[in-house]
UniProtKB/Swiss-Prot annotation:
This is Netrin receptor UNC5A. It is a single-pass type I membrane protein. SMART domains: DEATH, IG, TSP1, ZU5. Homodimer and homooligomer. Interacts with the cytoplasmic part of DCC. Interacts with MAGED1. Interacts with PRKCABP, possibly mediating some interaction with PKC. Interacts (via extracellular domain) with FLRT2 (via extracellular domain). Interacts (via extracellular domain) with FLRT3 (via extracellular domain). PROSITE patterns: IG_LIKE, TSP1, ZU5. Residues 817-897 form the Death domain. Receptor for netrin required for axon guidance. Functions in the netrin signaling pathway and promotes neurite outgrowth in response to NTN1. Mediates axon repulsion of neuronal growth cones in the developing nervous system in response to netrin. Axon repulsion in growth cones may be mediated by its association with DCC that may trigger signaling for repulsion. It also acts as a dependence receptor required for apoptosis induction when not associated with netrin ligand. The record marks 396-397 as: Cleavage. The gene is Unc5a. GO terms for molecular function: netrin receptor activity.
Amino acid sequence: MAVRPGLWPALLGIVLTAWLRGSGAQQSATVANPVPGANPDLLPHFLVEPEDVYIVKNKPVLLVCKAVPATQIFFKCNGEWVRQVDHVIERSTDGSSGLPTMEVRINVSRQQVEKVFGLEEYWCQCVAWSSSGTTKSQKAYIRIAYLRKNFEQEPLAKEVSLEQGIVLPCRPPEGIPPAEVEWLRNEDLVDPSLDPNVYITREHSLVVRQARLADTANYTCVAKNIVARRRSASAAVIVYVNGGWSTWTEWSVCSASCGRGWQKRSRSCTNPAPLNGGAFCEGQNVQKTACATLCPVDGSWSPWSKWSACGLDCTHWRSRECSDPAPRNGGEECRGADLDTRNCTSDLCLHTSSGPEDVALYIGLVAVAVCLILLLLVLVLIYCRKKEGLDSDVADSSILTSGFQPVSIKPSKADNPHLLTIQPDLSTTTTTYQGSLCPRQDGPSPKFQLSNGHLLSPLGSGRHTLHHSSPTSEAEDFVSRLSTQNYFRSLPRGTSNMAYGTFNFLGGRLMIPNTGISLLIPPDAIPRGKIYEIYLTLHKPEDVRLPLAGCQTLLSPIVSCGPPGVLLTRPVILAMDHCGEPSPDSWSLRLKKQSCEGSWEDVLHLGEESPSHLYYCQLEAGACYVFTEQLGRFALVGEALSVAATKRLRLLLFAPVACTSLEYNIRVYCLHDTHDALKEVVQLEKQLGGQLIQEPRVLHFKDSYHNLRLSIHDVPSSLWKSKLLVSYQEIPFYHIWNGTQQYLHCTFTLERVNASTSDLACKVWVWQVEGDGQSFNINFNITKDTRFAEMLALESEGGVPALVGPSAFKIPFLIRQKIITSLDPPCSRGADWRTLAQKLHLDSHLSFFASKPSPTAMILNLWEARHFPNGNLGQLAAAVAGLGQPDAGLFTVSEAEC
């Protein structure tokens, strides 16, 4: 039955209405509605479905649908069918299946979309028919695209410091579709993938993690979509740099070559220099301070001494010293010889020709001498046999302890039976002994000689004077050797920083008064038959170039003992102060020694010693004791391992003793906490006419790279006026930490309002930035107050620089030998040198003591070095006596039991 063409739209409308009621018109996805009983495989299948589109300006958009198999396809927009005349239809046949294919297109204009009001959006959907049923496509939404002109938030100009973060916010204009945002830096696109220092947040803000100088620019936020591209106002970002001070230059040379003057130092605002409007550095770029340059004093000879007695070689001599005055502060040395000899004649002078009478006289004298020697030999043998058991094991330790008697550094008295003294003289070689001493030995010695005799030869109980038996030529050679050897001639005799003396196998001690520096020469350290003139010298840091690497610092004075190259059979002990706070976690300490070529070498790393080392150092809180068999120039150097490494500084305040002007200077010294540094400043202030006005304090200075600051406060303005231009003064960290600069100080100049003002009350603060500090409360009368002068008087007391023989030791020689003989052999019951070391708290390096022929001698030598002259012999005696059983029978233990 044929249907008229005019009826097709009506029939199609009826069918579509019924279908939409059954399936719903708001489905957005493809929906199939098969006819009951039909083949579902022949339902329409969409090859192309309509998609969401935007209308740009007034251009219509095209929607396309394509389905197979399909007999009809119609569009429905917002629930209404699109007129058939608005469809553009193309029919074809699928080449693979032979099924009919249909493609339909429609145009949607801006006016059609704008007719929809409210919240509903304009949408379109395709419906396709086949003999098996219908299928609906997904919905396609048609929106009008736009982008408003005004940004909701624009970036603002900023000024930021270097390495500070930057955030530039941007909220783009409203638009459909939503606008994409990008940033321009001076019209160049910012790409976060190429610059990890920047990124763009989800809210479109531009973030610079750390501002750089290159980030100074104009920044623009750009928003764009398919409709338009909008630019925000440009925001100027300026990255500025605040100025920073460079390090201070070294202090200039004092303006006065001799006496008081000024010196200055400067710094510049270039670390870094201010840029882009950054702040300039605060503070002064120039500092001035008062200085005092010591005037050089040329040396001058003292008067000649009297001529010595005419010697056997028909010569006598006289001497003089370069001490009237001694050269100092760079003055010239005396020129000429210090020793003068000339021929002489006297009864003692030997003549070349002798008559027969002289020959007979000489033969008689020789015969008498031989008889006396034989008689003396017999007496010695008898005496030693009676005393044969003297060196056997002592049955009672009271014999040991009773022998401990205090030894004074004053001349020996005649009532001490254990004291053996030697007083060498360059003109004669006479040695005086007092007492009865007999050591253990295989056989009695036939005679005693200064050059090769035994220390404890059997002598009577009386007083004996023994003359050296060497020929006259040897004595003459000895005198000439002392006057001509280079090291002896170069010694600065008479100075306060040196000690020297003549020593033999008996040993002795050299001390530089008020410095804490001494050299202990134990018995038998000098080979028997040798006589050495040994010196001990304290050097000023500016006179000796000690190279320091990295964070190294000088902790001790630089000390020389010599002459170098002399043969020693036992280690000597060099004692000197140090200013470090010992801590193995904070310091790496090294003992340095200058080689013959002048270079400095690390001869010992403290904490890494081994018994094979030639050197050993006993380090204590304020002093170190160096064992060495090679004399030379030494210094203790430390390298900080952490900021906890600390040096002790001693702070001293000096002011003039007499003040004749209105100005009054307070000098604050910052020294190493060592006796030698204190001595140097005291001597300097005595020359400047200064006095100590406060008790010294100790400040702990850390390796934190922070400077030391000094300031004065609470100065009564009605009486005094401070002339300090800044709030505080600074001593640079490296000037202190290096340790090689002397006389580090700052001067505070006050001016009296009235010449009659004499009372001064103020406060002086000294502190390390972010570290330790000290405060001085000054309250005294500048014309009458001398209460602190006694401290300097005590510090300036001198001592005997050289002690020779047993007078240099606290422990009597015989008792010392008994201790060594008894404690050197190992003992299973603990009565040996190891236990003694523990009792004396010297057991940190037992391996070093064990490597020596006599460990006990090393321990006693160290005890002597640590405790002279004020050591408590009673405590040592108690330690020795306590080694045995409770009955104090230490030496009753036989060798078989050990």
